[in-house]
Every structure is written in structure tokens, then in C-alpha cells.
Design a protein with these regions (language model features):
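Serine hydrolase/lipase
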Residues: 77-80, 135, 160-261
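Short, surface-exposed basic-aromatic patches at helix termini and helix-loop junctions that form
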Residues: 153-161
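Cys-dependent protein tyrosine phosphatase-like superfamily
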Residues: 1-12, 16, 65-68, 79, ...
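Gly/Ala-rich beta-loop-alpha elbow adjacent to hydrolase catalytic centers
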Residues: 142-147, 151
Length: 261
């Protein structure tokens, strides 16, 4: 067994990097995220059934000073993990009312105006630690809103696979640093590894996006609903896209924004 202390803040080995792969249907991600942070399972330890996986909360990471927050979800049957990076706090609802909101806005503005994102080093440590864990056989990333910056960064730096929505993009300087001298190759790998779910009316993305959208963009139906930059609107749109794709109207009793199966 691997000593857990050896997993902290280290350079991933080739065997660890080989764990990076995609397994989840990207359209299931907004519903999963909404249930995890804002839905009926937000205060529950119950596992979530998504696309044949039973994902339980394996580990939580929360760094109040930088605002970094999220979960490592794990399917015990396969060892596949989803590392979910949380988006911006909501006023009156989360982490100290407005305090968390101001922390998050500070991080977004710092990233947008070139003074750096203080969450990135913390996220880097959390990700490399997860890669090292023996229980984690494979892993992919999920990022919403400001969490999308982190997922984009880790995908470009390490070759991780990710699904992002409410996508804030990636700072051009970070893309250049981790492109290893070949921007076009880095952009191609990012398009191959990142799916970016988009609602055309998301004004927060337009106002606070920090840089280039590096993933392959999938435009969801009902784009104007995105003006409120809420994960539930993305979940509704993604569920509609699933029904359109699969040629069904949805099951009786289907709950708006649910992760699905």
C-alpha cells in the first residue's frame, strides 16, 4: 500500500498519469453537480447513481482562505473517481453568507487581471494526491464556474480529462507555460480532453471569463436561461439535450436537475 503522506504535493509518476481517462457522459455532469451541492443529496452521504456508476463521497477538500472547495467522488466497483471543483458561492446560502462570495469574486478578478489564482496550487496538491491513491484506479475532473479554471489548468498541465460548464476559460499565460513550447499541440490536446458545456446567455462567463475556452464546446439548448449562471439551469438544459439525443421525453417522476442514471 502507498503511504498516504507520500501522496501529498508530489510530481505524478507515469503510472499515476495513466489513470487519467473519461468515463462519465458529459451531459450528466450538471445534474450531478447540482445534486451534490444544491439538491436533495447536498446534506446526505448517500451515493449517487450516474451512468452505471455509484459515486460516493470519498474525500472532501476545502481551503477557506482561497475558496477552493470540492469532493473526490469514487465508484468502488470500478475505482473510477470524479474530482469535482465547486463554483462560486451563493449569497446568504453558503460558507459564511457574503464572506464566501467576496472570497470567490476576489479569486476570479485576480485571475482575470493577471495577478494569479490562489486556488491553483491547492488544487494541484489535491489532484496529485488523488492520483496517488491506491483506491483510485482512474480519474477525471468536473469544474463549474470558477472551478472550471482549475479543471482547465489541470487538463493542460497534466493531460487530465475534464467536463466543465459555466466555463471561465484558462489564462493565456498558464496555457503558454504548460504548452511545452507547442501551443497548437496543447490546444488540440485540450480540445480532445475537455468538454465545455455552454449556455449562450451566461453573462457571468462573458463578464468574468479569465481567458480562452480551451475545451470542445457543446452548446446546450435554451441558452438565454444561462443569464443567471446557476448550475440548475445548466442541468435542465443538459437533461433536455439527453432527451433529444436519446429520443425520449423523460421518465415519469423525473426530477428537474437530477443526475440521472
Amino acid at each position: 500500500a502507498v503511504d498516504s503522506s507520500a501522496c501529498r504535493a508530489h510530481e505524478p509518476t507515469p503510472l499515476e498519469l495513466a489513470k487519467q481517462r473519461s468515463a462519465i457522459d458529459p451531459l450528466r455532469v450538471p445534474g450531478l453537480y447540482s445534486e451534490l451541492f444544491h439538491g436533495r443529496l447536498s446534506d446526505s452521504s448517500a451515493a449517487m447513481s450516474v451512468g452505471g456508476m455509484r459515486l460516493r463521497r470519498h474525500k472532501q477538500f476545502d481551503h477557506t482562505d482561497s475558496g477552493l472547495s470540492g469532493f473526490v467522488l469514487l465508484d468502488d466497483a470500478t475505482g473510477h473517481a470524479l474530482m469535482v471543483f465547486k463554483g462560486m458561492d451563493r449569497p446568504f446560502a453558503e460558507r459564511g453568507s457574503w464572506a464566501g462570495v467576496f472570497t470567490d469574486l476576489g479569486v476570479v478578478l485576480a485571475a482575470k487581471f493577471g495577478t494569479g489564482n490562489s486556488q491553483l496550487p491547492r488544487a494541484d496538491d489535491a489532484y496529485t494526491e488523488a492520483l496517488c491513491e491506491e483506491a483510485v484506479k482512474s480519474i477525471e475532473l468536473v469544474g463549474y464556474s470558477m472551478g472550471s479554471q482549475i479543471a482547465n489548468y489541470l487538463a493542460v498541465k497534466y493531460g487530465a480529462h475534464a467536463v466543465v460548464f459555466g466555463d471561465m476559460g484558462l489564462d493565456a499565460a498558464l496555457l503558454k507555460i504548460h504548452a511545452r513550447g507547442n501551443l497548437e499541440a496543447a490546444r488540440k490536446e485540450a480540445r480532445d480532453h475537455i468538454v465545455s458545456l455552454s449556455l449562450s446567455g451566461d453573462l457571468v462567463v462573458k463578464a468574468f471569463g479569465v481567458g480562452e475556452v480551451v475545451g470542445t464546446v457543446v452548446n446546450l439548448p435554451g441558452g438565454l436561461n444561462g443569464v443567471f449562471h446557476q448550475p440548475e439551469f445548466y442541468a435542465d438544459a443538459a437533461n433536455a439535450a439527453i432527451r433529444n439525443r436519446d429520443g425520449v421525453r423523460g421518465r415519469d417522476g423525473e426530477r428537474t436537475g437530477q443526475a440521472g442514471t
